[in-house]
């Protein structure tokens, strides 16, 4: 993996990430393909939105279809017919989400499969082995996502466990001679001193890139902003910086301004399936009756397949009728919106115009789509 910084404006960075399956211009948004597919999208349609890289889920692919199936195809790229880069998360967040169904120990996490109830055990070493079989361009260390709320002692204990797992992840990744990139994940809850301790220890281990984890897990927006503002500028300058699971268009603009290079979130795809669509001038709830006879496109400034070919009235009809095509067209639009958003941010950084661009973005979004 190579990472090149091409331009900076304040803390914001314009870069290029070179990976085994291609290059990624940053800041970049990564659509989430949990089960080896971005919901309601073909790989060709996903590429047409401008997606340079997508995210796969180690935990879910391990459970279904299973590693033997993916391995028989030579890895996740051929299995899902996606020839661009893939990042896989480690499974830590999904295990965290199981709640009472899982038991965390020093060795790893015991849990009941959400599919058939089978007893399973996921460790840092197993996560690295799974991600090596998947052959993702970027793998993530196995960590514990610190819950919110957490006391300082609780967050410290969780963070220290994640650091021990980070060391084990690094060692196993190297033992497997995985040629791809491995990213560390900074934890520490809502406490700046713990974030600093986590980052220092991860930096000492050494990773290809560094992610900020444990945000957008239910904490107030002001806490997320505070931890982001504290942590982002302290991440190693010559490595890509990844803000996990975030977020809204406004979150992405704020993250870029803070120096973040990579983002992922289910929001554009999940919202699309629920009829919540993003536009330059605010959000549209396509199910609302006001769109029943509206012949306009969702967003006249958008060049996506949906906006070039279909009216709001048609999308309203599809949503009301429960047609699968509605989810497909909505997802195409939302993902193209996110790719356009990050492309414009890249251009603004290169032009030294990010501050005024961000101000225009906020003004436009507050106008309200009509």
From Swiss-Prot:
GO terms for cellular component: cytosol. Belongs to the queuine tRNA-ribosyltransferase family. This is Queuine tRNA-ribosyltransferase. Substrate binds at residues 89-93, 143, 187, 214. It comes from the Bacteria. It comes from Aromatoleum aromaticum (strain DSM 19018 / LMG 30748 / EbN1) (Azoarcus sp. (strain EbN1)). The keyword Membrane does not apply. Keywords: Glycosyltransferase, Metal-binding, Queuosine biosynthesis, Transferase, tRNA processing, Zinc. The lineage of its organism: Bacteria, Pseudomonadati, Pseudomonadota, Betaproteobacteria, Rhodocyclales. Zn(2+) binds at residues 302, 304, 307, 333. Its EC number is 2.4.2.29. InterPro entries: ArchSynthase1/Queuine_TRR (IPR050076), TGT (IPR004803), TGT-like_sf (IPR036511), tRNA_ribo_trans-like (IPR002616). Residues 245-251, 269-273 are annotated as: RNA binding. Binds 1 zinc ion per subunit. Pathway: tRNA modification; tRNA-queuosine biosynthesis. It catalyses: 7-aminomethyl-7-carbaguanine + guanosine(34) in tRNA = 7-aminomethyl-7-carbaguanosine(34) in tRNA + guanine. GO terms for biological process: queuosine biosynthetic process; tRNA wobble guanine modification; tRNA-guanine transglycosylation. Catalyzes the base-exchange of a guanine (G) residue with the queuine precursor 7-aminomethyl-7-deazaguanine (PreQ1) at position 34 (anticodon wobble position) in tRNAs with GU(N) anticodons (tRNA-Asp, -Asn, -His and -Tyr). Catalysis occurs through a double-displacement mechanism. The nucleophile active site attacks the C1' of nucleotide 34 to detach the guanine base from the RNA, forming a covalent enzyme-RNA intermediate. The proton acceptor active site deprotonates the incoming PreQ1, allowing a nucleophilic attack on the C1' of the ribose to form the product.
């Amino acid at each position: 993996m190579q990472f090149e910084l091409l331009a900076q404006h304040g803390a914001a960075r314009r870069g290029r990430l070179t990976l085994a399956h291609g290059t990624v211009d940053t800041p970049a948004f990564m659509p989430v393909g949990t089960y080896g597919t971005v919901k309601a999208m073909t790989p060709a349609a996903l590429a047409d939105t401008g997606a340079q890289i997508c995210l796969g889920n180690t935990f879910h692919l391990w459970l279904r279809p299973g590693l033997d199936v993916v391995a028989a195809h030579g890895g996740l790229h051929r299995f899902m017919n996606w020839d661009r880069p893939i990042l896989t998360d480690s499974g830590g967040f999904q295990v965290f989400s199981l709640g009472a169904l899982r038991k965390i120990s020093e060795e790893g996490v015991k849990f009941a499969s959400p599919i058939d109830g089978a007893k399973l055990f996921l460790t840092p070493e197993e996560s690295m082995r799974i991600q090596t079989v998947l052959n993702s361009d970027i793998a993530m260390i196995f960590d514990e996502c610190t819950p919110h709320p957490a006391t300082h002692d609780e967050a410290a204990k969780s963070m220290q466990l994640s650091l021990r797992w980070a060391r084990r992840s690094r060692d196993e990744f190297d033992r497997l001679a995985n040629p791809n990139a491995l990213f560390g994940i900074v934890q520490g809850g809502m406490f700046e001193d713990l974030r600093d301790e986590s980052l220092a220890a991860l930096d000492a281990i050494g990773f290809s890139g560094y992610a900020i984890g444990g945000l957008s897990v239910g904490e107030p927006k002001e806490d997320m902003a505070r931890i982001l503002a504290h942590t982002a500028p302290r991440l190693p300058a010559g490595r890509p910086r990844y803000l996990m699971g975030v977020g809204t268009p406004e979150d992405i603009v704020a993250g870029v301004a803070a120096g973040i290079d990579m983002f992922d979130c289910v929001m554009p795809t999940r919202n699309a399936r629920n009829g919540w669509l993003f536009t330059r001038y605010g959000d549209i709830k396509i199910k609302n009756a006001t769109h029943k006879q509206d012949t306009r496109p969702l967003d006249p400034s958008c060049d996506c397949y949906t906006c070039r070919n279909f009216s709001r009235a048609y999308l309203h009809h599809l949503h009301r009728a429960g047609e699968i095509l509605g989810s497909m067209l909505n997802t195409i639009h939302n993902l193209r919106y996110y790719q356009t958003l990050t492309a414009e941010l890249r251009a603004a950084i290169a032009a030294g115009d990010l501050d005024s661009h961000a101000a225009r973005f906020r003004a436009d979004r507050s106008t309200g789509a009509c």
